[in-house]
């Protein structure tokens, strides 16, 4: 006969965040001694940290606050919508918004509830039972627009874009948010074509030329064909040269110009993406 009650199991789960069977086993091994059961689960959690470190984190969320965008990753979508995980992300982004750290390492070193952010993450990892990774952070100073996209209604945002812009008024803010939505959808990498590195442009020209020659295009037509294909590349990766997802008859640049907006920079985070 078990020397613990269902109430003990419930209390232990609430205190440690461990699964039902883990709590039952801990209470059984501790012969009903609640404090010993807590200690055993804490020790097991510490031992599991090394194992968790080797696992991949392909789920998670992107969250934003006051000019900060950050990504917190986990292993499963079940944890991605876990209340403790959501609260952890909100706590971290609140700290980040106040301090505006330069990078992930700087954010991990900041204080949260009397501990470092990194320590809090590791403690939550042990409690939840999954590897948790604070993978990305960006912080902008000027007026910003944010767009967060959910892949599924029951999950938190998995794609986030933070745009810094110049412009005034509601129309400018709306246009900037439209630009953020554009980046989320079409994955632009640059604001203008001037930002595209010369070596990348040169490589695109080389590919366009070699492809055209392989297709047997006439020599005299090559310059125009190459230019057209390079311009096509710019439309793929340059925000201001794309057709707007909100109004396909206009370019993003035209919409921004109408609202008096200049995009200074942007970042796009996507859970599960390598960069």
Swiss-Prot record:
SUPFAM superfamilies: Elongation factor Ts (EF-Ts), dimerisation domain (SSF54713), UBA-like (SSF46934)
CDD domains reported for this sequence: UBA_EF-Ts (cd14275)
PROSITE patterns named in the record: EF_TS_1
Pfam family, one: EF_TS
MF GO annotations: translation elongation factor activity
Subcellular location: Cytoplasm
Listed InterPro entries: EF-Ts_dimer_sf, Transl_elong_EFTs/EF1B, Transl_elong_EFTs/EF1B_dimer, Transl_elong_Ts_CS, UBA-like_sf
Positions of region (Involved in Mg(2+) ion dislocation from EF-Tu): 76-79
Domain of life: Bacteria
Keywords, ordered alphabetically: Cytoplasm, Elongation factor, Protein biosynthesis
One GO cellular component term noted in the UniProt record for this chain: cytoplasm
Task performed by this protein: Associates with the EF-Tu.GDP complex and induces the exchange of GDP to GTP. It remains bound to the aminoacyl-tRNA.EF-Tu.GTP complex up to the GTP hydrolysis stage on the ribosome.
The family this protein is said to belong to: Belongs to the EF-Ts family.
Name of the protein in its database record: Elongation factor Ts
């Amino acid at each position: 006969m078990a020397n613990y009650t269902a109430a003990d199991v419930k209390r232990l789960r609430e205190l440690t965040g461990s699964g039902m069977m883990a709590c039952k086993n801990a209470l059984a091994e501790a012969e009903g001694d609640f404090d010993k059961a807590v200690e055993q689960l804490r020790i097991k959690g510490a031992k599991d940290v090394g194992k968790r470190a080797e696992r991949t984190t392909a789920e998670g969320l992107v969250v934003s606050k006051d000019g900060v965008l950050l990504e917190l990753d986990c292993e499963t979508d079940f944890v991605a919508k876990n209340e403790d995980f959501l609260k952890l992300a909100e706590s971290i982004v609140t700290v980040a918004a106040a301090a505006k750290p330069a990078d992930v390492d700087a954010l991990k070193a900041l204080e949260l509830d009397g501990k470092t952010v990194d320590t809090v993450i590791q403690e939550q990892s042990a409690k939840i039972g999954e590897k948790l990774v604070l993978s990305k952070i960006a912080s902008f100073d000027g007026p910003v627009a944010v767009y967060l996209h959910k892949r599924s209604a029951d999950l938190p945002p998995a794609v986030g874009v933070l745009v810094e812009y110049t412009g005034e008024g509601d129309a400018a803010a709306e246009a900037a948010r439209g630009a953020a939505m554009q980046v989320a959808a079409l994955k632009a990498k640059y604001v203008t074509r001037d930002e595209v590195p010369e070596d990348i442009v040169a490589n695109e020209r080389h590919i366009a030329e070699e492809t055209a020659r392989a297709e047997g295009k006439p020599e005299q037509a090559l310059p125009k064909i190459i230019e057209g294909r390079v311009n096509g590349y710019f439309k793929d990766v340059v925000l201001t040269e794309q057709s707007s997802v909100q109004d396909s008859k206009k370019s993003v640049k035209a919409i921004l110009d109408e609202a008096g907006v200049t995009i200074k920079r942007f970042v796009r985070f996507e859970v599960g993406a390598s960069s």
